Amino acid sequence: MKTGALTTFLALCLPVTVFATTLRLSNEVDLLVLDGKKVSSSLLRGAESIELENGPHQLVFRVEKTIRLPGNEERLYISPPLVISFDTQLINQVNFQLPRLENEREASHFNAAPRLALLDGDAMPIPVKLDILAITSTAKVVDYEIETERYNKSAKRASLPQFATMMADDSTLLSDVSELDTVPPQSQTLTEQRLKYWFRLADPQTRHHFLQWAEKQPPS
């Protein structure tokens, strides 16, 4: 897809639905999956927030933070993947509140019994269900989307069954053939649909930065 066409395509993807909840992102949180869908890290890189519809949501993420070691050394701490589910029906903003994580002892405690809070726009706690996402795959590269689907089918603490089958068949994401001048390979069409989905969720500033980047890309 040529850059100009890509820009027009994304501009037309702006949602007609008015989103009512802003999820404020944290530079210490690596978002992996949102509501059963793998997060497009390239599109959300540098984004400050994501716009969500009111209702139930589920995040899969890792906490990443530099911690101190003895001898004034430092290392990057990366937590196990965590699952958190919550409802934004009457909430207009969601903010992460992480516990103190400054050293190996605190990191070990967090690994064993993770705890964190989500706060609304008035800094009031949002009811959440938090769990560790146990990885069943032995592959070097983990498909967190598939692992999340398994988790949601297992009736665990933070499971949301409505997100268990959303990604079971990628064909459900494909647009009607009438929207396309020609029928591209399924993988290409799916890539466009995923890009469209994450573009819709990105905040206006991130959309603007992405469109600026897209304009500078050479035509394929």
Curated annotation (Swiss-Prot):
The keyword DNA repair does not apply. This is UPF0319 protein YccT. InterPro entries: UPF0319. NCBIfam families: CrliSynInhib, PRK03641.1. Residues 1-20 form the signal peptide. Keywords: Signal. Disulfide bonds: none annotated. It holds the Pfam family DUF2057. The keyword Lipid metabolism does not apply. Belongs to the UPF0319 family.
